[in-house]
Amino acid sequence: MKLFAAFLLLAFSSAAQAAQPIVATWHLDHQELNGEKKETEEMILRVTPDGDKFLFAFSVPINNIAFVSLSYSAKLDGTEADVKNARGNKVGTVEITVPSPSHYKLVMKGDNRPNTTVVLTVSPDGNTLTSQSDSTQAGKPMHLVQTFTRR
């Protein structure tokens, strides 16, 4: 009986993770900084289940190879997790919560980096991810909007 209960819990946890609409490979389409359209270099965000966490891996293609430049594996309950650069060095922390379905709130902190609040929203059809981030740099407020497409 205990084994069956453990199996059900594991199955439910796996199903809950798979049901997260953010799990996908997202390609950056365009971005705006403080309302002005900015040039967009190719960037890919892959979000995958990672045990009881989710792995967020940002990559840029170099010679047709996806080079991971930033990543973090975090629970969606606000637990602090490390943000790592391409070399695996910690460059900050992230806390992720899910205030409502298809909405993810991130608080990112790091030495020599501005604290940043990010809201990720998956569209109702599941094909678009919008990232809105706010920070203060050199005393000026910065609002970045990035739009990704599921591929």
Regions found by a protein language model. Give the residues of each.
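Positively charged n-region of N-terminal signal peptides that target proteins for export
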Residues: 1-4
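N-terminal signal peptide c-region/cleavage motif recognized by signal peptidases
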Residues: 11-15
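Hydrophobic small-molecule pocket/channel-lining residues, especially in calycin-type beta-barrels
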Residues: 18-151
